[in-house]
Regions:
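A broad, structure-centric signal for solvent-exposed, well-ordered loop/edge residues
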Residues: 17, 39-40, 68, 82
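Short, small-residue-biased leader/transition segments that mark boundaries at the very start
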Residues: 4-5
Length: 102
């Protein structure tokens, strides 16, 4: 578990704007796991919360604009952070996600 925590790269800190969609502000630190590959070829995405280094859940996402699906790992997220992440992935008609708790 500690290995996963050490491999996190947070490239979009909480409170920063998305590079392509400046109206979107990240509610929780967001990044990826170094030395991994997801379906889009980039590193596996992570939401890194404020409550430690335990994996809480995963979000399975379908993005109709990008025409892909992804899995995002939630690490150390509080209930409030999990709720904000869930809402983020379900607030538009173009992206939907399901939360799978550990």
């Amino acid at each position: 578990m500690k290995d996963v925590y050490k491999r996190q790269v947070i490239d979009r800190p909480k409170g920063t704007a998305h590079p392509k969609y400046p109206d979107f502000i990240y509610p929780v630190d967001y990044g990826f796991l170094r030395d991994t590959a997801s379906m889009d070829g980039a590193g596996i995405d992570v939401w890194a919360g404020s409550a430690g280094d335990q994996i809480n859940a995963v979000m399975c996402i379908v993005d109709l604009l990008k025409r892909d699906s992804e899995i995002k790992i939630l690490i150390g997220c509080t209930e409030a952070e999990i709720s904000a992440i869930y809402q983020t992935h379900n607030e538009t008609a173009y992206m939907k996600g399901i939360l799978i708790r550990r």
